[in-house]
Structure formats: structure tokens, C-alpha cells
Swiss-Prot record:
GO molecular function, one term: excinuclease ABC activity
One of the GO BP terms on file: SOS response
InterPro entries named in the record: GIY-YIG_endonuc, GIY-YIG_endonuc_sf, GIY-YIG_UvrC_Cho, RuvA_2-like, UVR_dom, UVR_dom_sf, UvrABC_protein_C, UvrC
Domain GIY-YIG, residue spans: 14-89
Lineage of source species: Bacteria, Thermotogati, Thermotogota, Thermotogae, Thermotogales
Originating organism: Thermotoga maritima (strain ATCC 43589 / DSM 3109 / JCM 10099 / NBRC 100826 / MSB8)
UVR domain sequence ranges: 194-229
Function: The UvrABC repair system catalyzes the recognition and processing of DNA lesions. UvrC both incises the 5' and 3' sides of the lesion. The N-terminal half is responsible for the 3' incision and the C-terminal half is responsible for the 5' incision.
Localization per record: Cytoplasm
Complex formation: Interacts with UvrB in an incision complex.
Protein's recorded name: UvrABC system protein C
Amino acid sequence: MKEKIRKKILLAPEEPGVYIFKNKGVPIYIGKAKRLSNRLRSYLNPQTEKVFRIGEEADELETIVVMNEREAFILEANLIKKYRPKYNVRLKDTDFYPYIRISDDEIPYVEIVKRKLWDGTYFGPYTSVQFVRNLLEILQKIMGFRTCKSDLKRIKRPCFLYHLGRCIGPCIGNIESHEEAIRKLREFLSGNMEEVFDYLKEKMETHSKMLDFENAAKYRDLLLNLSNVLESQGVVFEENINCDVLVHAHDLFVVLRVRNGYLVGKISFEMEGGNVEDFIREYYISGRGDIPKTLILESDLDEMDYSSLGFEYVGPPRSTTEEDLLEKAKKNLENELKMRGLRKEALEELMKLLNMKDFPYRIEGIDISHLQGKYTVASLVVFEDGFPKKGDYRRYKIEQDHPDDYESIRTVVKRRYSKHPLPNLLFVDGGIGQVNAAIEALKEIGKDCPVVGLAKKEETVVFENREIHLPHDHPVLRLLVQIRDETHRFAVSYHRKRREKESLRSVLDNVPGIGPIRKKKLIEHFGSLENIRSASLEEIARVIGSTEIARRVLDIL
């Protein structure tokens, strides 16, 4: 440790505050303390390698005195969020979690996003993308908020969602109604769901009294569908409770998110060397998770007042319901730890089986999908520490006029790894031929990486021109089968989308009056043949600007 830093530590004030270790002006560690003098003196006699490294690397120490520990806590969180020092513990997502974003436009739109970018209001994270899609679809039918990103000043006619009754139509002047829809959505996603349920019940009863049974049935179905989507998460509580439940063991943290009595998410994060206080700072104060009224913990935190952050209560359970939730969270934590143990064992077995030098922490898998050589695509999926990392998945379009899986694999491998770093292990869906194609491609770009395959028929592991037969319940085979199934699923879904778009282009080429511009408009607006078939003549005419040509489109379809 440099002498000037040692002197500054000895002169540190006894007040609460934040301290910043820097190297060449860049913060490398930011901490807080109830008494700066006591905390900083611990760096004079380091007990851990991390503390020792901070002291050795730092060439400058800055202290900021504040009024109390709460202010220190908030300032520390904001500074860490701003500078992201390398020695501060960070949350590591163990999976991809979606958010619902309401944009900060003058007339907001609503979308599902992968991560927060601080450019709107975010709700989440949620456990399942499909759950969020289903939820937003139902809520849009009820409220009518917009999901398009179009520049509303340039729109002269409403889109087909308006004509389907799913959008209020702020593009044609219904601004106040849309503002009310966005308000209701914010309230609902914040956990105040009663207003929406009461609205649907009232509408259903009103139409029933008027003998308008068709509309009464519509609101009844919306009410049932909304309840079913929320209940699909598996747990419903009679009390309209809004809380998060946080438990942790070792470096793993699990959060159960309950809104209005519905379990809307179970998420898990890894934080090396972090405690509950670190997690609250990194997850809630930095804005990764929306703040509920109540945060249930296994025990009290030391004299920290979290009310100024938005919590009404932070601490151990106060009721039987909260105790039940804590038990559920603990069971989920146990399952997560068990799964991680099994995955680690499988990866260690895989490392031994393939005689690898490095632990296969990151595995990337490739699969090819085509229809007799047409619409060829490739998928690339990523597994880290034995679990899918969906945010890193990629898709590739391959142009070829005849089926050739080997050439397709060579193409994808070269495109991927000429620009991106290699994984610890590359997985290819296929046998010796596919594996060798990947190895050849790597050699062509001057790179080397272990490549393993899984032959489809007998699920035989292929490595270095040899076949390895494993029992069906072997942990390595189970892991490779999961990777194979995921690469196949991702490839097939992209292939289907490409085939639908190409089919749409092919059909539209046969319609007199449909040139490149009109064809592009139809594809961008409808996306598939099925959507055009279900559209009205008027809607198609609005998109392409001609009723006569719209009629030709429907005639051919």
C-alpha cells in the first residue's frame, strides 16, 4: 500500500460516509461505513486477497462524509451504478429474465425487453417470456394501450390492431383514453390489480342486465383468461399481498415476486462474496427490480431504514402467509443449489470424458435447419455453467441452392468465430461428419477449440473421430441432450419464420400490381400469409393504397 494512502486512512473521519479507492483516477472499489475511520483501518491489515489487492492497486483514496448511514448506503449504490468498479461485487444473472417497458415517449408504447436501459418505466423481472406475452396480450385487449413503435405524427390511418379492438388508437387522436389505459397498466403491474378485475366484473354484469349476452360473454372470457394467465405461475394467495421474498446461501440469491396475491416470478442471481445488504443495493437501488411494499427476509438487518427507498417493511415474516412464502423461497433455493450441484458434476464428468484442459464453463451449440436445402438457417445457443444463457443466443441465415449440412456448419463457424471469442467447448448437432466440418472451419480461420457432437439415432457422443456410448441416465449425456434439444428448437423456430416470410414473398410475386414497395409494406405489416388471410379488404387496401389490388391479394390467397 502506498504511504500517502496509509496516511489518509489514519486521518479518516469518524463520521458515516463513502470511500473510493482509485487507480489512475478510475474507481476500483467503492464502499460505505458507519464510521469511516474504523472501516478504512481494516485495509491496513488485510484479511482477504481482495482487500489486499485493492490496497496494492490503489494510488488514491477519496472519502465523502454524509449525515447518516442511510445516506451513505444510497450514495454508495449510486456511485457503484455510475462507475461499476472492478472489485465491487456484482449480480450475475443465472438466466434471462424479461421486463415490461413503458416507453418515455409523449405517447408511450409498451414492449417486452431483455434488460433495463433507463429510458422508460420498467416492471419485472419476470420468470417466463411466454407468461409476459400472454399477460400483455390479455391486458391490451382490456385496456387498449399501443404496442407499435411507429411515429404517430406520420400515421394517417390506424393499424389493424385498432380495427381488432386491441388498441384505442392514439394515432387518430384518442390521446386521453390512451393516457388512462397507460395509467391502468402502471397500476396493474405495480400490484394494484383490483381496479382491472372490478372493471371487468362491472362490464360483464352491466351487459348481462341489458341482455347484451355477446358482450357480457366477452368480458367474462377476458376475466377468466386474465385469472388463468396469472394462476399459470402456480401459486395464488387469498390475501392481496404485494411483496418480494429474498433468501440466499453461499453466492446464490433467490427472489420470489408476489403481486396482488399472485406469484409472478421466481428469479435467481449469483453474487460472489455478497451479503443481503449488497444484494438490496445491487438489485433494488440500482433499479434492476421494482420495489414492492414489503421485502421478507430470514432475519432483521442491522438498524438500516429502508423506508426512504420505497419499502414499507423489510424484515422477517409477520404473518402465517409471509412464513409460508419464506418456506417456499427456501425450498426453491434448495432446489437451485441441488441443480447447480448436479450440473457442476455433469460438467466435471464431461471435462474428464473429453480430456479437456479447461473447465467447460461456456458451451456454444450449433444446429442447421432447412427444407430440402431451402430456407437454410443456423442456430447458436449458449450454456454457461450448465444453464442456458438466452440473451447470448444468435441466429444465422445461410444462402445455398442445395442441401449441404457440412458446408452450412463451416459457414456458420467461420462467421461466428472470425469475430467472436471461442467458447470452452463447441457442440454440433450431428455425427462425425458435422464435427469434422466444424473443426475444418476453425482451422481455416486459424483457431482451435474442442468440438463435440451428438449423433441423433442412438444419441452417441462424437469426439475426435470416435464414438462414445454412454448409459441413457449418464449426467453427461443428459446435459448434451439438453443442449442438442435447445439448438434444434431454436433453429426450427427461426426456420419456420423464414419459410413463412419467403412463402409470403413468393405468393405476392404472383399478384398483378404488387411491386417491391407494396410487397415490403405487406410483409412488414402482416408478417405471414395467415395474417393477411384473416385481414379485411379495407385493412389490406389501407396498407397498399388500392382496393382493387387488395381484392386481387385476397383472391389469390
